[in-house]
Amino acid sequence: MGQMVEDRFIRKALFTKITKNEQIDYKFNSKVTEHKKQSGYISVTLDNGKKLNTKLLVGADGRNSELANRAEIKKSGWKYNQSALVCAIEHEADHNGVAWQYFMPSGPLAVLPMTGKRSCIVWTEQNANAKAINLFDETRYTKILAARLGNFLGKFKIIGDRHTYPLELSIADRFIDERLALIGDAAHSVHPIAGQGLNAGFKDIAVLAHIIQDAHHRGEDLGSLGVLKRYEEWRRFDSAQLAYSTDLFNKLFSNENEALRLARNIGLKLLDSIPVAKRNIIKEAAGITGELPRLMH
């Protein structure tokens, strides 16, 4: 279905690529404080006072995107009464490269394999519980996690920092403005139950690159609304479909109604017995269905 890749490895690979490309001028620890549309370009002011001019500005500044706010791009959606508790563990048993997900009344608990005998835990709890658990010392936190996790990985200990963040669903009403394109969490934020937030962001990048390349070959203005509209039409419906599908799954699997639980179990067993349907769902979850941009072939 896919591979788990640690964030640090992705960052290192990207950094290696951009530092070897002389056509990329990169700036760290810089923030856009202002952007203004001009005739034929967009002017960007950084927090150090430096000004840059570009044909196209790409907003990848997260779900609280200041670029989107300044462009008056509103979002639709809602906050869940859930937060994700995230940590890494080192364990006795081998995970064999297999990811696990447990569905509990408070929300899913995912065990995602990392290198060696290590796994990443993404553990969903109601907001009040998550806030309390996050304040516990490591011994008590580990004890609560062990009660939910069971012993299939043997004894374990938490390594590194623990994090928590509130969960929400949001879709930007527009993914574009003149000379501005939103990607990733700046455009859409989904429940982590399907583990597709990062993949959706990568697909945004691949589609935008595809559109820009085609426009360049045609001699078109890369930041024009006509060009950027193609990106929005390709990605917005797909992103909304993913967001609402994950919302439905969260409601379905975080509900302990007996009739619903029985129907859910029957449905999963039926799906497991139909290989074609199972393969199609795996492809859908991996984001490799429908029209794919060149970078994803």
State where each predicted segment sits.
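Short, solvent-exposed loop/helix junctions and linker helices
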Residues: 3-8, 135, 202, 257
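A general structural signal for well-ordered alpha-helical segments in protein cores
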Residues: 7-11, 15, 82, 86, ...
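Structural motif
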Residues: 38, 105, 115, 176-177
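C-terminal helical "tail/cap" subdomain of flavin- and related membrane-associated enzymes
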Residues: 210-297
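Conserved FAD-binding catalytic core of PHBH/FMO-like flavoproteins
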Residues: 56-164
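Solvent-exposed, non-membrane alpha-helical residues enriched in polar/charged side chains
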Residues: 15-19, 100, 142, 146, ...
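Conserved N-terminal helical subregion
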Residues: 1-70, 78-83
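FAD/FMN-dependent oxidoreductases across multiple families
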Residues: 129-225
